[in-house]
């Protein structure tokens, strides 16, 4: 059966590649695809058409997308974008590498190192002198941290770049999330610990077993699908008050890596999940659910809480907001820890992820044109189009140059159908996705403009925020401290492969956790299941002897680089 599934996935991946070949940058040899777009005044303009594949799920923009065509009119180019469907990133990228044929742009996600090792990307630094928006996107020191072992830059990390200062209003990262209806029912209590969080959900479900339409409420979901099983396994380091280094805890005093998987807090956390599963609070379908089913279930408004990254469930939030009858079913983050008195660090400042990014492939027929396309996407006028839309349609500008939106504009920005037809942020291309617009007056988008952001909220969220004395999602959590020199360590672990000893251990850790942690959560005898898991974990994963020393070496390297050594 597994072989059949892998074969089916490979066929789907091949179909995806063939589909892009027919419509994007790798069509006829030595010919760059072009098409005609209509301008706002009805004129026809011929533009270049590039192709891109992003090895993550996403929403495809509609043909004739208004903002995409507006951008194309101004810069003379557009990009047809395909997203991951029906297979893993490794499977999709593996098919491309095997066929040695690629779209013009690729973000390979977890298949990035394979792409670089296969020689699939061109060296961006061989071209960037003629494209200042790209070359100046990062500092020399930041570019040096992105360089491959041969000294070249093959990818551009797209996310987390700040213009001037961070002004974010949305906690886009990981948290324990809870619906505003649950908090309102309990008169907006202060929730500080894991026990308090689940106690509130238990009491709410007991008092409110069903939705108004009669469907059962669900207390808690846990996404375990593929690489997204972080929703199950990494909460212990947050509960101990550490930021999201992803692969380990880093002791702030000794700068030594600690394995969060085996701490006392980890055992207490999984024991709590086990208890909640037995009580019926945790959805019994949760450990076998695929990502699409998880998003669908959240979109119904039935799920009271979960751990997740906000960007990972944003599509569900959009669906809830667009429904019109589920305003009290949207989520806010709560900064809980394992015990009272532990200082939480759920929110962090933007950080550079050197393990991933977008690259131009060797199949691209017009490398200079592709560089120019990315360069133009970073022009101030185009950034505003990407992030805000069209003035007078998606936002207004007052006499002081401040951007505002009407209720209709705000509703449109939360309607996925409208977004697909009218807006085009080119989200997986380089962007200043934090901080200010280049005009120095406005946020880079509506989620970074505090006054506009608050006005865009529905009354249920405003009531919740007012009750807690805040105006943004970020203010629901502790203020983020300055990032440490080693942060984030997940940018190191994301790049590990089975070609190294530490990469082998890292891969085996994931296998063991995928296999045993769901069993731990549903076991009749938790202690026996936990002991079996730890025994298998320690037998199969040389964490202390191989992985932690590798982490420690990387931590010290980053500290030395930051110190200029």
What does each model-found stretch correspond to?
Residues 6-9, 23-196, 242-249, 256-259, ...:
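Conserved N-terminal structural module of periplasmic/extracytoplasmic solute-binding proteins
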Residues 44-50, 75-79, 99-104, 118-122, ...:
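Loop/turn elements at helix/coil->beta-strand transitions in domains of secreted/extracellular proteins
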Residues 114-127, 152, 316-344:
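Ligand-binding "clamshell"
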Residues 247-255, 261, 266-269, 326-354:
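Active-site-adjacent "gating/activation" loops or surface patches in catalytic cores
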Residues 152, 157-230, 251-297, 302, ...:
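Helix-loop-helix "hinge/cap" segment bordering the ligand-binding cleft or interdomain interface
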Residues 384-515, 524:
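Conserved small-residue motifs centered on glycine
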């Amino acid at each position: 059966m597994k072989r059949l599934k892998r074969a089916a996935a490979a066929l789907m991946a091949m179909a995806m590649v063939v589909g892009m070949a027919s419509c994007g940058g790798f069509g006829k040899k030595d010919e760059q695809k072009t098409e005609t777009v209509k301008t706002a005044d009805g004129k026809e303009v011929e533009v270049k058409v590039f192709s891109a594949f992003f090895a993550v799920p996403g929403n495809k923009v509609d043909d004739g997308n208004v903002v995409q065509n507006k951008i194309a009119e101004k810069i003379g180019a557009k990009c047809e974008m395909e997203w991951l469907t029906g297979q893993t990133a490794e499977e999709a990228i593996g098919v491309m590498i095997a066929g040695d044929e690629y779209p013009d742009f690729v973000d390979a996600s977890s298949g990035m190192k394979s792409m670089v090792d296969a020689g699939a990307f061109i060296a961006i630094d061989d071209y960037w002198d003629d494209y200042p928006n790209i070359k100046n996107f990062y500092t020399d020191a930041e570019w040096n941290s992105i360089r491959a072992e041969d000294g070249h830059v093959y990818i551009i990390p797209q996310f987390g770049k700040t213009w001037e200062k961070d002004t974010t209003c949305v906690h886009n990262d990981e948290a324990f999330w809870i619906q505003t209806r649950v908090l309102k029912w309990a008169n907006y209590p202060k929730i500080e610990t894991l026990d308090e969080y689940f106690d509130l959900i238990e009491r709410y479900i007991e008092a409110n077993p069903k939705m108004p339409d009669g469907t059962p409420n669900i207390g808690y979901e846990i996404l375990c699908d593929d690489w997204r099983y972080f929703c199950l396994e990494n909460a212990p380091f947050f509960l101990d008050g550490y930021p999201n280094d992803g692969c380990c805890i880093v002791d702030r005093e000794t700068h030594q890596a600690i394995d969060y998987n085996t701490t006392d807090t980890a055992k207490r956390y999984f024991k709590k999940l086990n208890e909640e599963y037995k009580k019926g609070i945790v959805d019994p379908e949760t450990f076998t659910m695929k990502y699409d089913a998880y998003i669908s279930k959240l979109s119904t408004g039935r799920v009271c809480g979960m751990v997740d990254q906000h960007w990972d469930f944003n599509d569900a939030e959009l669906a809830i907001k667009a429904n019109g009858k589920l305003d009290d079913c949207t989520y806010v983050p709560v900064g809980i820890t394992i015990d009272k008195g532990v200082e939480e660090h759920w929110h962090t400042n933007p950080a550079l992820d050197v393990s991933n990014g977008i690259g131009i492939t060797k199949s691209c027929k017009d490398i200079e044109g592709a560089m120019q396309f990315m360069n133009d996407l970073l022009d101030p006028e185009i950034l505003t189009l990407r992030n805000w839309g069209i003035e007078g349609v998606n936002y207004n500008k007052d006499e002081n140059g401040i951007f505002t939106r009407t209720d209709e504009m705000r509703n449109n920005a939360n309607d996925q159908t409208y977004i697909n037809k009218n807006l085009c942020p080119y989200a997986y291309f380089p962007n200043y996705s934090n901080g200010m617009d280049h005009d120095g007056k406005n946020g880079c988008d509506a989620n970074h403009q505090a006054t506009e952001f608050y006005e865009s909220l529905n009354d249920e969220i405003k009531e919740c925020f007012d009750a807690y004395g805040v105006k943004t999602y970020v203010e629901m959590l502790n203020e983020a401290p300055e990032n440490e020199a080693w942060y984030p360590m997940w940018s190191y672990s994301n790049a590990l492969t089975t070609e190294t000893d530490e990469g082998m251990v890292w891969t085996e850790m994931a296998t063991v956790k995928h296999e045993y942690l769901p069993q731990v959560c549903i076991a009749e005898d938790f202690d026996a299941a936990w002991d079996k898991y730890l025994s298998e974990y320690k037998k199969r994963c040389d964490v202390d002897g191989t992985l932690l020393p590798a982490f420690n070496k990387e931590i010290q390297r980053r500290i030395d680089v930051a110190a200029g050594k």
